[in-house]
Amino acid sequence: MSETAASGLRLFTSESVTEGHPDKICDAISDTILDALLSVDPHARVAVETVTTTGLVHVVGEVRTSGYVEIPKLVRDKLIEIGFNSSEVGFDGRTCGVSVSIGEQSQEIGAGVDQSHEVRSGENTDADDQAGAGDQGLMFGYATNETATLMPLPIDLAHRLARRLTQVRKTSVVSHLRPDGKTQVTLAYDESGRPVRLDTVVVSTQHDPDVTQEWLFAQIKEHVVDWVLRDSGLESTLDISGYSLLVNPSGSFVVGGPMGDAGLTGRKIIVDTYGGMARHGGGAFSGKDPSKVDRSGAYAMRWVAKNIVAAGLADRAEVQVAYAIGRAKPVGLYVETFGTAKFGLTDEQIQDAVLHVFDLRPAAIIRELDLLRPIYAGTAAYGHFGRDDLKLPWENTDRAEQLRDVLSLG
């Protein structure tokens, strides 16, 4: 690190976790239940939290729906899909306890969403004023041109490593692996804020008891880390020589999943978003239907930020939106480009263009992004943004030209 500081470089780190991490198990269960409910009732109101510990899954929350889903079966099927299918790995979806404690959504909250403050005060102007935000809060979105997906490179690489770690386990490319795991990537950034060197990669993976750490290191390096670095094509833009690789630096990792640590929905919000490169409003995503602006507002902000960068208006963009519970119109919007704006544009000019091009009322977001669909379970692990393996509507850059037109950039 001292050599890095002396060279004027700064280190930035992001982490990811696999779908077998206890918190991610809970996110996956919550979003699987959400998707199932949206499949039978697209207008279902859902707020589902999951807790897991040794031998037990507990599902709690509030739901308003005209449909029915068999939650215990959804829980068990998801656990087995992840890989917790035997007591030998520390958790068995077929035999674990599953308890469900779900009540009805508060009528007061429901009323504020169904009939906004604008409607109740006579301020409404069109149908999109009808629905109020499901809660107060602030949400951030971010984009940067340092990767093809317009995501920060540290979290992008960390997710790719975590996905590959799961892939080699499920396809038996590497034997003796178990579902729980984490990845971490440290990159050196130069004075202009560009990533220039891979500094450290950490991979921690649950494994069977009869493997040596030397064997595991070789397998992870060849089939996970080296594979991802080749697949990413970073050699031409990033110095990947001489990086430090740490595999299970704490030693043996046999006990994992819910047997190793209790899990809870919504505890990996930095993994879910930008790996710490951008600010976060604090609200989690999983288990929440899109009337909850914690989710839909954050997705809209990624959509906005990505279009700003895709339009060439800035190299980096962070946007914030804020809502009041029961109000349709946002109470605030903020755009920050960190001095990277192009064409002599100010952040205020870009902000005005965003307000002209994007309708950020919850009903409009839900309609424009078509969010009343079962599209959420796939986002529960490996990030909600920058996913080139999923077709997520908030990743579209369909408003980039409109932003340029509003700013008379042609």
Swiss-Prot record:
Name of the protein in its database record: S-adenosylmethionine synthase
Span list, region Flexible loop: 105-115
Pathway linked to the protein: Amino-acid biosynthesis; S-adenosyl-L-methionine biosynthesis; S-adenosyl-L-methionine from L-methionine: step 1/1
Main subcellular location of this protein, as a coarse class: cytoplasm
Binding sites annotated in the UniProt record for K(+): E49
Cofactor: binding details: Binds 2 divalent ions per subunit.
E.C. number: 2.5.1.6
Positions with a binding annotation for L-methionine: E62, Q105, D261, K292
